[in-house]
Amino acid sequence: MLFYSFFKTLIDTEVTVELKNDMSIRGILKSVDQFLNVKLENISVVDASKYPHMAAVKDLFIRGSVVRYVHMSSAYVDTILLADACRRDLANNKRQ
């Protein structure tokens, strides 16, 4: 649930989602769920010439299992806080 909480803080920011089929899609993150499925609005495909069928698409739902990476501006990430949260989450999971 750690990364679910992290991605919830990125709502209404611009992200680039790289899919397992090598397509990269840039858009505004509108929602995320516990399976890390994401909804993007105002999308654009990074290499539009390779994926012309995506030119007319403006809003997109992406299943979490097809996501390889999510890129965002480093201004949105407090790496020290995130590393600390990961350590606490790991410690809590070991106790259970």
Curated annotation (Swiss-Prot):
Which compartment or compartments is the protein found in?
Answer: Nucleus; Cytoplasm
Which UniProt keyword terms apply here? Cytoplasm, mRNA processing, mRNA splicing, Nucleus, Ribonucleoprotein, RNA-binding, Spliceosome
Q: Sm domain: which residues?
A: 2-76
Pfam families, alphabetized: LSM
Q: Which residues form the signal peptide?
A: none
One GO location term (cellular component) = catalytic step 2 spliceosome
Instruction: Provide a GO biological process annotation.
Output: RNA folding
Among InterPro entries, the record links this protein to: LSM_dom_sf, Sm, Sm_dom_euk/arc, U6_snRNA_Lsm2
What Gene3D superfamilies has UniProt attached to this entry? 2.30.30.100
Q: List membrane-spanning regions.
A: none
Recorded GO MF terms? U2 snRNA binding
- Show the PROSITE patterns listed in the entry: SM
Question: Family assignment?
Answer: Belongs to the snRNP Sm proteins family.
**Briefly, what is this protein's role?**
Component of LSm protein complexes, which are involved in RNA processing and may function in a chaperone-like manner. Component of the cytoplasmic LSM1-LSM7 complex which is involved in mRNA degradation by activating the decapping step. The LSM1-LSM7 complex loads onto the 3'-end of single stranded RNA. Component of the nuclear LSM2-LSM8 complex, which is involved in spliceosome assembly. The LSM2-LSM8 complex plays a role in the biogenesis of the spliceosomal U4/U6-U5 tri-snRNP complex by accelerating prp24-mediated annealing of U4/U6 di-snRNA.
Assembly, in brief, is: Component of the heptameric LSM1-LSM7 complex that forms a seven-membered ring structure with a donut shape. The LSm subunits are arranged in the order lsm1, lsm2, lsm3, lsm6, lsm5, lsm7 and lsm4. Component of the heptameric LSM2-LSM8 complex that forms a seven-membered ring structure with a donut shape. The LSm subunits are arranged in the order lsm8, lsm2, lsm3, lsm6, lsm5, lsm7 and lsm4.
Name under which the protein is recorded = LSM complex subunit lsm2
Native organism is Schizosaccharomyces pombe (strain 972 / ATCC 24843) (Fission yeast)
